């Protein structure tokens, strides 16, 4: 795409300015309120490992709840060196998420032109899945970046005729090493990415057939050298846990499978919108642009093969929760940049057609056309509610399990939970002026109603840990240890911790029976005995109804806060 028909030259500095603006927007969305985010859901998988196991034990076990071996080991060492907090658990994903905003647009700017790269940069900057996974202590943002780096590196190494005759030995070795390391590390971080990063090798083997006979042997040897190096690196980190604990992976298979509703729902996840019209518009633009992407970027071809192989693996093995669109969308997360790149290419192609003949009004309309997919996805974005202040629950699964409210299973779940008027009454106070520690905390978010409490109260809600107060150990609670320095949770047994984190109230959720769709389950029965301990520690409640008990927390030099009544 030359961009000659557009109102601004394809080489205009304007497009670099747009890419710079996209970087700022993307950085803002990924860093907004990140320091106050509560650790939730699958983010706890690695924590449960490194607080009870040594690195050598983690190296030999993928775990039933896939915690990502290298992240678990890294977190263990961070705990020993300088202590772990929510931010230290998330920084690798944040770094990779921010790097993606730079690396991918720059990579496509050459073959597709700056206008397409600029629109692409804006689209990935505001992609809800890319934003959410960049903020999450799970490996998806890392494997997405490593996966596409592997594909790009392979193209520089590719044992084709041009590479054999014109590539420099040093450059090819560097490209091959980059591919091998990126592919092995991505697979170690999240084994399901394996087929995606292996796809370039399969594609390359087929390419060897097209090399002239005189060069075919050299091409095959170069391919074999990279395949052996990549296989050896991958085997060195994947085989030990696979052989030591083969059931850790096998036990997660044959449980669920994607169905028609799953395959429909993933498009809303990948495009990041609840609006069917927006999904259809983006699909139309992607269909218009994908042929250009396919021709111009070889990594798009190997990437498409990798995505197909990954989907076939998931469909064949039936991992747990694979009937949910959110699960398939993250297993195939590398498709998001590819789809958005096709949308960007289709948008620029459409704009070029509109700009001919190149009259002033047509060129202006062409420029506006290029903003259409960005505007449509921004207006319908599920990220908007997450920008509310304060909001410490942005990583809660309710926000992204399904962007369509009528398909979100958390909506009826939370509607069935008891809700005290205490939360809405707190809204009379200035937003963010009160901090509440709520207990019992459930790291599996389907039992943690804090997003609704924060939305109604406009105040900050953090987990109140019962460990050391009335229980010895609970899943989803950190032990009282100087190595574990969570900023967005508080030990209720520790008066100094309550004071340091500015807790005004402790809200105790009374046990209840949750009835959803005819299924009943007791919630809180395992910690019911803690109520008496809390009453003894904090004294008379500041508020109590049939659902919750609220205790005021006095601090030195500050009187106890008064709860709304």
Model-identified regions with their sequence ranges:
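Extracytoplasmic
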Residues: 382-565
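Membrane-interfacial, low-structure loops and terminal tails that flank and connect transmembrane helices
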Residues: 1-12, 159-173, 210-220, 352-364
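Internal/C-terminal transmembrane anchor helices
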Residues: 362-386
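Start-transfer (signal-anchor) and selected internal transmembrane alpha helices
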Residues: 1-28, 109, 297, 364-371
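Glycine-rich, flexible loop segments associated with nucleotide phosphate handling
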Residues: 16, 167-178, 215-223, 327-331, ...
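Hydrophobic C-terminal alpha-helix "anchor/cap" residues
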Residues: 2-4, 78, 186, 426, ...
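Membrane-proximal helix-loop-helix interfaces that form the catalytic/acceptor-binding platform
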Residues: 18, 23-161, 172-352, 377-399
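Alpha-helix C-cap/termination motif
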Residues: 110-111, 353, 357, 429, ...
